[in-house]
Every structure is written in C-alpha cells, then in structure tokens.
Amino acid sequence: MISVRRGFSQLWYWGKRGVIGIIALWMAGILIFAFLPVPFSMVMIERQLGAWLTGDFAYVAHSDWVPMDEISPYMALAVMAAEDQKFPDHWGFDVGAIESALSHNQRNQKRIRGASTLSQQTAKNVFLWDGRSWVRKGLEVGLTAGIELIWTKRRILTVYLNIAEFGNGIFGVEAAARHFFNKPASKLSASEAALLAAVLPNPLRFKVNAPSGYVISRQQWILRQMHQLGGKTFLQENTLD
C-alpha cells in the first residue's frame, strides 16, 4: 500500500513539474517570438510528423519568414477582412462573434461555426496541437492573452501571415506567393491576396490553384470587405502597415 502511495506521489510530483516546464517554455516562446522570427509552428510539426508516419517522405512543411515591410499591404488587409475585421480593436477575443457562433451552433450542430480571432489562431498555430477539446481551448485562451499582452498587434499579424497554412506543405505568405503566383509576397495584388485569404478556413480542402465556385465567391466578398474597411488607409490608421 505504501509503495502504491509512493508511486502516485512520484507521478504527481513529476507530472506537476512537467506541466510547469511546458508553461515555462510557452512563456519563453512568447517573449522570444516577440522579437525573433518563428522558425516553425506546432501545426507545421504536426503535418510533417503525420506525413512521415504515413510514409510520405517527400512532404516538406515549407515556410520562408519575411518581415511585415516585405508583405503586400493587401495581404494584411485581406486576412483581416476575411477572418477578423475587429482585430485592431479587440483584446484577443471577439465577444460578439463568440455569442453569435454559440447561438448558430446550438441551432445547427451539423455545421459548426468558429469565432477565433487572428490572435487566437496565431496562438494555437504556434503553440498548440490541432483538434477540439475544452483543455485545448483553455490553453488557447491563456496563450492568446499572453501574446496580446506582450506582442503588438502588428507583431501578431506578422507572425500569423508567416505561419498560416495556404496549401499542402505551404506555410506563410512568402512561400504561398512564390508557389502560386511566382512572385514575392511584397508584390501580391489585391485580387491575389483575397484569393489566398479565401482558402484560409480549410487550405487542404480549398485550392488556390484550382479555386471552386465557393472560393471565387469568397474571394470577391473579401475584396468588397477590403474596400469597405477603407483599403490601405485602414492599415495606416491602426499602425499595421
């Protein structure tokens, strides 16, 4: 009996230390990535390991980090128009969007709607595994609060654009621009930026190089939203250019 208690005690001791260690690593990551390029994300690691485990050794999760100054302003505008139009104003969470999503999901459980902001998407893509669970969501809330506290909005947007998945093995806007349009991210047009943003809900299902009718329709909607937000002036007014 004593040995069993001792075993549980040791398990609790090392488990607690492990959790503290992981939290410390996350905190260090938030501080380091406030200034340095993010070399890879948890999503990239998950995709790469998944490919290897299924025998796809040709798969390479590819990303090329570029600063915001080397990204077309249309791209930053497009992702905000598509994913999070209140990004400059909220503190990491869009309460109105969350309430709307909860109401929708209660009425229609077959088509679940999300309400993640760009800040939340950045936090979970960099630091967390893919999937849906209350544990993961709780960790996402804490990490989102952390990056909102330490990083500027411009930094969050920069990291997001450099780690977002735009296709199979294609991460970050620089890799996407060169793969799909044979040009650097700095040269993307409004239409090209809107097309890239249009596939973000599910880049493994929706294709930039073979857009479905839905993707084209979403691209046109994003272009209209970019105009309604105020175009490049919107970025300048919120110090995001």
Swiss-Prot record:
Please tell me the species this chain comes from.
Yersinia pestis
Q: What is the lineage of its organism?
A: Bacteria, Pseudomonadati, Pseudomonadota, Gammaproteobacteria, Enterobacterales
Topology versus the membrane: Single-pass membrane protein
Quote the NCBIfam families the UniProt record gives. Answer: mono_pep_trsgly
Q: Which Gene3D superfamilies match?
A: Biosynthetic peptidoglycan transglycosylase-like
Family to which the UniProt record says this protein belongs: Belongs to the glycosyltransferase 51 family.
The alphabetized UniProt keywords are: Cell inner membrane, Cell membrane, Cell shape, Cell wall biogenesis/degradation, Glycosyltransferase, Membrane, Peptidoglycan synthesis, Transferase, Transmembrane, Transmembrane helix
* Location in the cell: Cell inner membrane
Which gene name does the record give?
Answer: mtgA
Q: What molecular functions are annotated in GO for this chain? A: pentosyltransferase activity; peptidoglycan glycosyltransferase activity
| Role this protein plays | Peptidoglycan polymerase that catalyzes glycan chain elongation from lipid-linked precursors.
Q: Does the keyword Glycosyltransferase apply?
A: yes
TM spans (from-to): 18-38
Q: What is this protein called?
A: Biosynthetic peptidoglycan transglycosylase
- Tell me which Pfam families the record gives: Transgly
EC id = 2.4.99.28
A GO BP entry: peptidoglycan biosynthetic process
